Amino acid sequence: MPRYDDRYGNTRLYVGRLSSRTRTRDLERLFSRYGRVRDVDMKRDYAFVEFSDPRDADDARYYLDGRDFDGSRITVEASRGAPRGSRDNGSRGPPPGSGRCFNCGVDGHWARDCTAGDWKNKCYRCGERGHIERNCKNSPSPKKARQGGSYSRSPVKSRSPRRRRSPSRSRSYSRGRSYSRSRSPVRREKSVEDRSRSPKAMERSVSPKGRDQSLSPDRKVIDASPKRGSDYDGSPKENGNGRNSASPIVGGGESPVGLNGQDRSPIDDEAELSRPSPKGSESP
C-alpha cells in the first residue's frame, strides 16, 4: 500500500519553522532531491514549495518533516489550501480569502491547524508574536470589562454588607467571653470574703480563751451575789442588783458595818426585833 494518497493531486507543501538565515535557493536545493520543484514561495519564517508530481511532494514530506535544517527543526506538511491566483479550486477547501490563518496570515487553513513557528505564542488580535491576546495592548482591559458587567451585579453588592456584619458579631461575642473570663477571679475573691464574714466563720475563729473571757462577767456576778442566811460578805463585790454592799458613804455618814467589822443584813435585823428583850421580861 503506498504511503501517499494522490486522490486530490496535492503538489503543494507547507514548510514551517524556518530559520532566519534560510533563503529561497536553499529550499530549492533541499527539495529538488525528491523531484522537480515548480515554485518556492518564501515568507518570513515559513514557505510553500510546489512540485510537478504529487508523488514527489509526498516523498519530500515523508523524509523532511521534523528534520534539522539550517539550525532549526522544520515541519513539512501538505498544504490544505490552493495557492493564490489559482483558478481550479474545485472541492479542495474554502475559496481564497475565506479560510485565512490568523497565525501565519496564509489562506487555506485555520489557526488551530497552523504549524508555522511558535503559533501558540502569537496574538490572534494584532497578529504579532511574543504575546497572547489576553496581554495584547489592543484588547480591552479587564477593568473595563468588569465595569461593564457591574450593573448586573448590583443586587449582589447590596447583599454584601449583610454578610460583612457576621464577622463583627463573632468578634463581639469573643470579646464578651474574654471579658467575663477576666472578671471571674474577682468574683471568687468576693465569695471568699463573704464566707469569712459569715457568723459561722466568726465563731470558728474565736478561741476557747476568748469564750471564757466573754462569759466571765456573768459568772462573777452570780458568784458575788450574797447567799441567803449568811452573815458575812466575802468581798465588796456586786450583788444580784448590781449595788455595792460595803461602799463607804461620803459626807460623814455611818457605815452599816458594825464595830467588829460585821455586815448586818436586813434579815438579821428583823430577827432581832422579833426577839423579846431581857429587860422587858424582867419588868413588872
Swiss-Prot record:
It is found in: Nucleus. SUPFAM superfamilies: Retrovirus zinc finger-like domains, RNA-binding domain, RBD. Residues 159-180 have a biased composition (Basic residues). Residues 74-97, 132-284 are annotated as: Disordered. Pfam families: RRM_1 (PF00076), zf-CCHC (PF00098). One of its GO terms (molecular function) is zinc ion binding. GO terms for biological process: mRNA splicing, via spliceosome; RNA splicing. The keyword Zinc-finger applies. It comes from the Eukaryota. Belongs to the splicing factor SR family. RS2Z subfamily. Component of the spliceosome. This is Serine/arginine-rich splicing factor RS2Z32. The gene is RS2Z32.
